[in-house]
Amino acid sequence: MSNITILDEATANKIAAGEVVERPVSVVKELVENSLDAGANRISVELTQGGITGIKVVDNGYGMPAEDVQLCFLRHATSKIKRAEDLNSILTLGFRGEALPSIAAVSKVTLTTRTEDELAGTTMQIEGGYMQNVVPTGCPVGTIIEIKDLFFNTPARRKFLKTANAETSQVSDLITRLAMARPDVRFELRSGNRVLFSSPGTGSLKDTAAVIFGLDNVRSMLEIGYQGKLLSVAGLISKPVLTRASRHYQNFFINGRYIRSGFLSSILQQAYDTLIPAGRFPIAILHIDIDPTQVDVNVHPTKMEIRMAREGEIQEELLAALSDSLNVPTAITGLWEIMPGRTKNTATDQRAENLEVKPDSKEKELQPKESQHPRLVACDLPSGKIMPPRHDQEQLHFSSRRIAPVRGKNSLLPDEGSSINREEIPPVVDVKEQQLKENPNTYQPAETLGFPVLVPAGQVPPTYVLAHGEGGLYIIDQHAAHERVLYEKYLYLLGNYVEAQMLLEPLTLEIPHHEAQLIIKHIVDFNELGFILEHFGGDTFLLRGVPTNAITEPKEVFLDLLARLQENPSQKVEKNLVLDHLAAAMACRDAVKSGQHFSAVETKALLDGLARCQKPYTCPHGRPTLIQISQEELKKRFKR
């Protein structure tokens, strides 16, 4: 007796549906892409319980004739291609004929459609892959498709779905990307009676981007337009001053299709090399048109991944297009933090004065004009703010409010109520504890044992500092070294006392819906970390308070944390990890950048600060801060 069984069609369809239909967002993607292929310029998506119990998509496309209504639910039935050769030049979003039968196999579907040539439309109902009835009906031109009880007949799949809010967030993220792909189409996303997202549909990418990212961010973006031999590029890319902590805000569209591509993301990052710090990523909306014969979209069931021929030439042209847009004066506006003038009446200000960056000239004076040159952030100051706001920003006003101490593995202070033998604690801990009580911003660590005593010897523009010591010659990465110094200072301060600075004028945050749900879920956790938030209705929040040491760019720091939280699969606010990221983000932003020229005083201050770090040999991102060339290696190289 044969052990091989030919599965019936219904069972085969349920299995095949697993490749195409993973969750509600998969259904929405397939249905909306069908609407776009049908020429619709108005598409409405309505969710019930995040799409788990209901999805309704309405479009004003050209609809389907009555004879095609039943055919569209047959597997591999499609109007997009006729033969295999058509795959070489496919421009539609769908083409396999798998989506509708896969959706129908695991849900209850009602399809209503009419073409312009027909007097009456057609309604068809399918349940679990089996047709229930087909009747004529009155309806406008276009298509209405309703999906109910997704995975009702496959409970194993249904139990792995997330909460309604989580599923809604995924759909919201998809719709915003589709709106960027087609700014000429008006998209609307609703959950119950609430409108979550609505794009203008004016055809302007800037208008659409302003709705998604906010008008202020769009003003900090550059338009890109390029026509080459192999491809054309259009879209928006952020100025180097506008970055995020993840690649989530990078959007690539090949021939109108949204894709995920590490290849394209690496090219984008290469274009920003030396313009933004490591670990920071630009925002981008890039529409790339390529000869369809050079692109294979038939790679993955979701069609989110593609293959491209002639990748080397594509990389060369795309990099040229991006570099041309970034090599304009307006592209780097605001890249440097400039010290505004202020009264210098404290020891902190006087010591900061000695660390002012010297311009690249033959002048011996160490006092450049503050309006012309960036200032090196003091790396060993015992107190004071790091990097005040830029001169072109509004001055923020604060009032203090103490937040309960946040303690974790990075805390240098004992837990309250713990039993302590004072004789076992080195004196330096008692000193630090006393300093911290008197002035929470005080931080002056002891020198690290084993770290070489370095004597400054000069600078190798634009990035490196030379020094010599017992071990030979040392080459220091100025940005990485300063980043490590600031990171340990910030981590110390945040790990012991989180003090919130209350803004007299709160900052308004307009957040995409899927991120707004995370804020609502974790708003108490954020408050404990010093980010005092108030839900202002819809997807708008008021940022009323920020951690003391994050006041230079509080909005950017908070959005970075939100991006990291979104990347975390568990989407839990783990305080130690958040504090670590907050310290690293502030250090990366405030550290000196490549190209700053140091005086001898500034170089000595940087090396002294590095010597006091607990882990002076790498920056927070794991890059080395310095390398050593031993005396033996030098003698060998010089044949001695």
Curated annotation (Swiss-Prot):
InterPro entries: DNA_mismatch_repair_CS (IPR014762), DNA_mismatch_repair_MutL (IPR020667), DNA_mismatch_S5_2-like (IPR013507), HATPase_C_sf (IPR036890), MutL/Mlh/PMS (IPR002099), MutL/Mlh/Pms-like (IPR038973), MutL_C (IPR014790), MutL_C_dimsub (IPR042120)
Pfam families, sorted: DNA_mis_repair, HATPase_c_3, MutL_C
GO process annotations (BP): mismatch repair
Record keywords, A-Z: DNA damage, DNA repair
GO cellular component assignments: mismatch repair complex
Region ranges (Disordered): 343-389
DNA repair among keywords: yes
Regions of compositional bias (Basic and acidic residues) in chain numbering: 350-373
Classification via Gene3D superfamilies: 3.30.230.10, Histidine kinase-like ATPase, C-terminal domain (3.30.565.10), MutL, C-terminal domain, dimerisation subdomain (3.30.1540.20), MutL, C-terminal domain, regulatory subdomain (3.30.1370.100)
A molecular-function term among this protein's GO annotations: ATP hydrolysis activity
Homology family: Belongs to the DNA mismatch repair MutL/HexB family.
Function (record text): This protein is involved in the repair of mismatches in DNA. It is required for dam-dependent methyl-directed DNA mismatch repair. May act as a 'molecular matchmaker', a protein that promotes the formation of a stable complex between two or more DNA-binding proteins in an ATP-dependent manner without itself being part of a final effector complex.
Name this protein carries in UniProt: DNA mismatch repair protein MutL
Source organism: Desulforamulus reducens (strain ATCC BAA-1160 / DSM 100696 / MI-1) (Desulfotomaculum reducens)
